[in-house]
């Protein structure tokens, strides 16, 4: 397989950003993010238009979209905790693959990196790297794969998916039809000079491996049934609580990882465990904010399980449900931004503390289910597959398996040692494909 790079440049907004918009203050929630890049990969099997025309239209509409999301084309100033909206541009690459898309998808998992390979220079070899980068990959069959990377400082998955849908709409029907993003978080929750939170742990020297696993709908139905049977001695109230598919898969994966923690040491007892999820706070508080506000607006859910001997899936879903329910109930009453900021900081503080201490199994998850990633339509239909790439730390991402249905695709990023065990786990293999 050969990859030819046809274009590599910094793409700027089609219209210069006005002087009064050239600084965007970051919120406290932006400030506390780990500044890593999140990758998104969108597969489109066949394009109806000439590929040259398609690429030109994608480039011009992306440039127009940057006039609305002008901060994305700027640069991060960590000293002042602002984004300098100076129109320096985002990374932009066009490549051509000499194979058909279906052949590419049959290849190694590492092929996903090829879909973003042209972006590495932008993101790692400059003193002030772009906050986002896009790579367009054309295939022999007329298929297209769009790889995107966003610095987490500029926003969460809600913000990233909104940007991609805005670009797609600009390409499909014109920039005038695209809604302007809103930036209301920083005035309510300004950045702080001193953050009283521990740093996240360092994973320097650890080699992480990323693999994709799919729980089809029928597998989830079977898993739910077997989890209920496993809890045969549970009370009637517990049996009535039907966990969401995200909680179900999270609990099953956590159970598998707990068993992995015991196996090499031949232990009958595991360490206590902490299941960590990120909860979108939009529409959950009483704050005077737009429902589609851009930026980072989520809280960390720390669900602890103190069961150290053969935890059941229902034990773990109960821990998750309890932790999520408590946060939902608390934030629903809050109309004070300082209280929300304090709650978020406390959740991050607990997460980083336990993550770094190493006395518990800490399993970090992020659910992208129900975000409109499968709605990103540039004019030739929705993507046939949406995926992500590796992360610089242990993380398990849950995504919708396909445009329709309730299956879940899991992108697991684990240490090389843990991934070997994970792929051989007998129960996992019976549910995933």
Swiss-Prot record:
Record carries keyword Acyltransferase: yes
InterPro entries tied to this protein: CAT-like_dom_sf
Alphabetical UniProt keywords: Acyltransferase, Transferase
Catalytic activity line of the entry: benzyl alcohol + acetyl-CoA = benzyl acetate + CoA; (E)-cinnamyl alcohol + acetyl-CoA = (E)-cinnamyl acetate + CoA
Gene3D superfamilies given in the database record: Chloramphenicol acetyltransferase-like domain (3.30.559.10)
Uppermost EC category: transferase
EC number: 2.3.1.224
Catalytic machinery residues: 152 (proton acceptor), 377 (proton acceptor)
Repeat is among the record's keywords: no
Coiled coil, from the record: none
GO molecular function, one term: acetyl-coenzyme A:acetyl alcohol acetyltransferase activity
Protein family (similarity comment): Belongs to the plant acyltransferase family.
Function noted in UniProt: Involved in the biosynthesis of benzyl acetate, a major constituent of the floral scent. Can use benzylalcohol, cinnamylalcohol, 3-cis-hexene-1-ol or heptanol as substrates. Has some activity with 2-phenylethanol and 2-naphtalene-ethanol.
Protein name: Acetyl-CoA-benzylalcohol acetyltransferase
Taxonomic lineage from the root: Eukaryota, Viridiplantae, Streptophyta, Embryophyta, Tracheophyta
Annotated gene: BEAT
